[in-house]
């Protein structure tokens, strides 16, 4: 018998796996479809959804013989029907159709609709008790306790599809909950990692969009520059793995090769490494509990040469500190944190505020909301969506005075 404890079992999913991809025309959806495209004999596409890219959605539906597709924009239904004419693909439009797509019978669902619009469809998939690969931050940041309780009640399995939480998910398998001492989420540090605070304050949009490692959308790239994205990931990790804020650390790692680490009681630290390519965590989710053939480049540590680490600076990047504050406040504070940040980032993109004012608007919104005494547990998706809108309105009200201070 080999002393190496490697499994030699038959694949857990030997047959064809039915899959649905919510947000199929976005960046996460594109990576997911790329993996499915590589091994089409393993998958049957049940449902696909998109926001407004009808041509892209119809093209995917035809390529993968999807059974149902939905476009979020109800005004695009006629266009979608025309694009699918002559096929057997059923289609719909609007929120109800997207939720219908999520609730259809599939073994595996990728929940990659961005924003609060992704919450109800993800819940529809969860309620079926299926396996859900979660790439929507709002499900956890805005409704974490409620979302995870609902998943547990339905018997659904939640697989984290983003790189950091997927890394933690893999590393956590090395031990038991009572043996865990902390998890460590890594951050690239973004384009302003070495900048002085005064320079960060005045950073331009073009500078904020120059991420050193990842190719991402505009909003998440700005969040990386402010380290708000890492704050959101701390919040997600807390809900996803039932961890206290004190059990979650952040470590700046400029090379973005080590994505997450877990420390156990015996002081062993287990880490997951990989190239900065979203197809790696998505492939882990798509094959789980088996491993499928990846599409990303192999990791060449000799070529990379060195891996470096440093502590985060909570003074130059206050958005990270605010995430911990929101977690400790609870009762909807993380929802407010996320909503205020979205308003602030939109204002920065529109050149209404300086980069440094993003965190100030988030902090002022949180403080104002706490002073109003409106904190309460969120008991439903509608509660989370209502608080999200309330927080956006509050942030918008505070925005002019933040902008005036910066001028």
From Swiss-Prot:
Where are the disulfide bridges? none
Q: What top-level branch of life does the organism fall under?
A: Bacteria
Q: Which GO terms describe its biological process?
A: isopentenyl diphosphate biosynthetic process, methylerythritol 4-phosphate pathway involved in terpenoid biosynthetic process
Pathway the protein acts in? Isoprenoid biosynthesis; isopentenyl diphosphate biosynthesis via DXP pathway; isopentenyl diphosphate from 1-deoxy-D-xylulose 5-phosphate: step 1/6
Which InterPro entries does the entry mention?
Answer: DXP_reductoisomerase (IPR003821), DXP_reductoisomerase_C (IPR013644), DXP_reductoisomerase_N (IPR013512), DXPR_C (IPR026877), DXPR_C_sf (IPR036169), NAD(P)-bd_dom_sf (IPR036291)
Q: Which reaction does it catalyse?
A: 2-C-methyl-D-erythritol 4-phosphate + NADP(+) = 1-deoxy-D-xylulose 5-phosphate + NADPH + H(+)
Specify which residues bind 1-deoxy-D-xylulose 5-phosphate according to the UniProt entry for this protein: 137, 163-164, 188, 211, 224, 229-230, 233
Q: Which family does it belong to?
A: Belongs to the DXR family.
Q: What protein name applies here?
A: 1-deoxy-D-xylulose 5-phosphate reductoisomerase
* Organism per entry: Rhodopseudomonas palustris (strain ATCC BAA-98 / CGA009)
């Amino acid at each position: 018998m080999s002393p190496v404890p490697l499994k030699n079992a038959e694949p857990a999913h030997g047959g064809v796996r039915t899959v649905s991809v919510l947000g199929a025309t976005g960046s996460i959806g594109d990576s997911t479809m790329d993996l499915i495209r590589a091994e089409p004999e393993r998958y049957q596409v049940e449902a696909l959804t998109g926001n407004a890219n009808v041509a892209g959605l119809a093209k995917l539906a035809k390529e993968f013989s999807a059974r149902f597709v939905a476009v979020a924009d109800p005004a695009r239904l006629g266009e979608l029907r025309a694009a699918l004419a002559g096929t057997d693909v059923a289609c719909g439009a609007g929120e109800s159709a997207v939720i219908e797509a999520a609730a259809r019978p599939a073994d595996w669902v990728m929940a990659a609709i961005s924003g609060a619009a992704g919450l109800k469809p993800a819940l529809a998939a969860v309620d079926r008790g299926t396996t859900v690969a979660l790439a929507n931050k709002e499900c956890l940041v805005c409704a974490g306790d409620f979302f995870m309780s609902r998943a547990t009640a339905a018997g659904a399995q939640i697989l984290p599809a983003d790189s950091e939480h997927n890394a933690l998910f893999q590393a956590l398998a090395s031990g038991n909950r009572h043996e865990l001492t902390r998890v460590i989420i890594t951050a690239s540090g973004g384009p302003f990692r070495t900048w002085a605070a005064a320079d960060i304050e005045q950073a331009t949009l073009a500078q904020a969009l120059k991420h050193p490692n990842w190719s991402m959308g505009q909003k998440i790239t700005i969040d990386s520059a402010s380290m708000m994205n890492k704050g959101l990931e701390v919040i997600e990790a807390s809900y996803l793995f039932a961890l206290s804020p004190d059990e979650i650390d952040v470590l700046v790692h400029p090379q973005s090769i080590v994505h997450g680490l877990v420390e156990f009681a015996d002081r062993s630290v287990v880490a997951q490494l990989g190239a900065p390519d979203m197809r790696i965590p998505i492939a882990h989710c798509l094959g789980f509990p088996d491993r499928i053939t990846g599409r990303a480049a192999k990791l060449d540590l000799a070529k990379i040469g060195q891996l470096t680490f440093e502590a985060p600076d909570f003074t130059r990047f206050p958005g990270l500190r605010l995430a911990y504050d929101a977690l400790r406040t609870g009762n909807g504070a993380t929802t407010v944190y996320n909503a205020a940040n979205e308003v602030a980032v939109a204002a920065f993109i529109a050149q209404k505020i300086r980069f440094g004012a993003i965190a100030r608007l988030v902090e002022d919104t949180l403080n104002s909301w706490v002073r109003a005494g409106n904190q309460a547990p969120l008991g439903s998706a509608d509660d989370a969506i209502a608080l999200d809108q309330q927080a956006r309105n509050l942030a918008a009200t505070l925005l002019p005075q933040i902008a005036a201070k910066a001028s």
